[in-house]
C-alpha cells in the first residue's frame, strides 16, 4: 500500500512539474505528460475572458484569437443557410426550395408579406434557425451587442434568396429577434455541459447534450478536434460560471372538450397526454445588490419547457423564456429589493394534435419577440 501511495505521489509530482512548451510547428501550447509522453493541446483560455475560437479561416493573431472574426462568422452564416436549404431541398424535397431567377427578382423587388405557414415552423423552427446565426458570431468571440446583427442578416438572406415564398415580415422577426434570445440562452446553457476536463461516458453525454443545444459550437468542436481532446488545465468555458437551478417533473394531462369532435373517431375530443416539464433558472436575479456586479445581458434568465410524450401531440408543447437584458437594482427597507430592467420574453404554446386537430379549446400562442 505504501509503495502504491509513493508511486502515486511521484506520478503526481512529475505531472505538476512538467512544463508546457511551444514551437513554430505547434502554435498552441502543448502539455506533455513526462511519464506517458502523451501530448495534450492547451488553448490557455481564461474562463473570465472571451473564448478564443479554435477555427481560423484567415489565420490568427499572436494571442490566439482569429483574424477577421466578424467576416468569418458571416461566412458561417451563409454556410448555415446553405446547409439548411440543402437539407430541405435534397432530403425533404420541399417545393419552396425550387429557387429560380424570377423568384429572386420578385423577392428583391416585391413587397414583404405576413405569411400563414405552419405554427411550429414559424414560431419555433425560425427562432431555432436564428439561434445558429447568433451562435456563429458568439463562437468567434463577438459580444452580445455585435452578435445581434447576425440573425438579422441571416434571416434577411434566407427570406430573399432561399425560398420561393415572398419574404415574410413575421419570419424575419421570429428568426432575427427570437433567434438572438434563444441563441444567447443556448450559448450559456451549452457552456455548462461542454467541459474538456471530463472523460468517459460523462464526457460523451456532455458533448451530445451541448451539441443538441448549440449545434454551431458542437460543429466547431468536431472540426477543430476539441471534442475529442482532454485538457487537464482548462475546461474550455466561454462564460464565467453562474449559479443555476434545474428542476424536472412528470405528469399527465386529461383533455376533454364537449364541443369538439375528433376527425377520425367522430367522438368528442378527449385524451390523456403524459408529459415531462423542465424549469431552469440561470444566474442570480439580484447579482448587482448581492455581489456588486454590473448586470450583463442574459446573466439572468428563466426557462420553462414542456415536452409531450404522446404520439398525437407536438413534442414541444410549451416554451417560456424570460431573459434580462439590463436592469437597475435598489435595496429597499426591510430586506425588500427593487429591480427595474428590460427583459425579453419568448412564449410558445402549441396544443394542436399532429393530425391537425386542435386539442380541445386549449390556446395556441407564440410571442417570439416581446420586451417588457
List each language-model region with its residue ranges:
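Bacterial N-terminal signal peptides that target proteins for export
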Residues: 1-7
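Bacterial N-terminal signal peptides
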Residues: 7-16
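N-terminal targeting leaders of membrane proteins
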Residues: 18-124, 130, 134, 138-140, ...
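Alpha-helical membrane-inserting segments
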Residues: 79, 83-87, 137, 157-161, ...
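Alpha-helical transmembrane segments that form the membrane-embedded catalytic/substrate-binding core
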Residues: 129-130, 162-191, 209-213, 217
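Small-polar-interrupted transmembrane alpha-helices in polytopic inner-membrane proteins
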Residues: 141-164, 176-180
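Outer-membrane beta-barrel translocator/channel fold
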Residues: 166, 170, 188-200, 344-360
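Contiguous hydrophobic, core-forming segments of folded domains
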Residues: 361-368
Amino acid at each position: 500500500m505504501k509503495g502504491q501511495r509513493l508511486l502515486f505521489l511521484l506520478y503526481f509530482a512529475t505531472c505538476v512539474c512538467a512544463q508546457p512548451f511551444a514551437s513554430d510547428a505547434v502554435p498552441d501550447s502543448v502539455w506533455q505528460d513526462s511519464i506517458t509522453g502523451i501530448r495534450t493541446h492547451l488553448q490557455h483560455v481564461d474562463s473570465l475572458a472571451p473564448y478564443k475560437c479554435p477555427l481560423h479561416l484567415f489565420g490568427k493573431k499572436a494571442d490566439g484569437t482569429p483574424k477577421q472574426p466578424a467576416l468569418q462568422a458571416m461566412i458561417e452564416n451563409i454556410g448555415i443557410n446553405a446547409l439548411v436549404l440543402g437539407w430541405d431541398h435534397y432530403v425533404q424535397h420541399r417545393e419552396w426550395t425550387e429557387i429560380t431567377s424570377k423568384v429572386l427578382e420578385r423577392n428583391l423587388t416585391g413587397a414583404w408579406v405576413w405569411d400563414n405557414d405552419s405554427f411550429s415552423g414559424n414560431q419555433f423552427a425560425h427562432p431555432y434557425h436564428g439561434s445558429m446565426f447568433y451562435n456563429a458570431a458568439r463562437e468567434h468571440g463577438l459580444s452580445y451587442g455585435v452578435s445581434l446583427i447576425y440573425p438579422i442578416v441571416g434571416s434577411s438572406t434566407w427570406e430573399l434568396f432561399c425560398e420561393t415564398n415572398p419574404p415574410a415580415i413575421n419570419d424575419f422577426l421570429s428568426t432575427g429577434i427570437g433567434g438572438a434570445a434563444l441563441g444567447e440562452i443556448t450559448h450559456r446553457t451549452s457552456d455548462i455541459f461542454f467541459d474538456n476536463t471530463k472523460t468517459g461516458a460523462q464526457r460523451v453525454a456532455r458533448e451530445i447534450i451541448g451539441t443538441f443545444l448549440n449545434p454551431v459550437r458542437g460543429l466547431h468542436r468536431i472540426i477543430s478536434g476539441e471534442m475529442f481532446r482532454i485538457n487537464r488545465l482548462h475546461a474550455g468555458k466561454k462564460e464565467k460560471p453562474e449559479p443555476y437551478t434545474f428542476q424536472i417533473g412528470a405528469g399527465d394531462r386529461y383533455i376533454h372538450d364537449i364541443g369538439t369532435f375528433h376527425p377520425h373517431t367522430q367522438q368528442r375530443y378527449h385524451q390523456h397526454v403524459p408529459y415531462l416539464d423542465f424549469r431552469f433558472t440561470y444566474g442570480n436575479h439580484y447579482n448587482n445588490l448581492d455581489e456588486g456586479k454590473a448586470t450583463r445581458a442574459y446573466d439572468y434568465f428563466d426557462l420553462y419547457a414542456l415536452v409531450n410524450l404522446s404520439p398525437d401531440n407536438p413534442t414541444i408543447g410549451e416554451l417560456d423564456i424570460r431573459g434580462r437584458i439590463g436592469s437597475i437594482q435598489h435595496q429597499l427597507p426591510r430586506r425588500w429589493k427593487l429591480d427595474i430592467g428590460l427583459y425579453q420574453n419568448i412564449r410558445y404554446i402549441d396544443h394542436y394534435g399532429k393530425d391537425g386537430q386542435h386539442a380541445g379549446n386549449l390556446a395556441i400562442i407564440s410571442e417570439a419577440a416581446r420586451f417588457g
